[in-house]
């Protein structure tokens, strides 16, 4: 994962909370987990096919995906990327608005 993208992602990731009863395993590197999750989401492979080369177990990757989804990480990251690209003048909002206007809504939707 490029350092520039990680600089946007890292502050948005919820901080690891140690178990109150102690024990458990050492926390896994957030960057490795994020990279593994993005791989699963973009490659078309299933969670069970996550290559071990990422250094993240399937249960850990899936658990963090679920936790981060509940914490709205993906929505906040999307907004952060749009803000960054917008500040550079690299977003064509006229096209985004046109695309949004051409999406058909369901009957009864507001």
Which stretches of residues belong to each language-model region?
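Short alpha-helical elements
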Residues: 1-110
């Amino acid at each position: 994962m490029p350092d520039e993208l990680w600089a946007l992602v890292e502050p948005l990731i919820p901080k690891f909370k140690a178990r109150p009863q102690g024990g458990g395993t050492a926390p896994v590197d957030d960057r490795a987990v994020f990279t593994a999750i993005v791989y699963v989401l973009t490659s078309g492979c299933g969670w069970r096919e996550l290559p071990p080369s990422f250094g993240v177990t399937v249960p850990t990757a899936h658990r963090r995906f679920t936790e981060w989804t509940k914490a709205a990480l993906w929505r906040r990251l999307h907004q952060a990327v749009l803000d960054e690209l917008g500040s550079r003048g690299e977003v064509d909002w006229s096209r985004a608005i046109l695309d949004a206007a051409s999406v058909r809504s369901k009957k009864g939707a507001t």
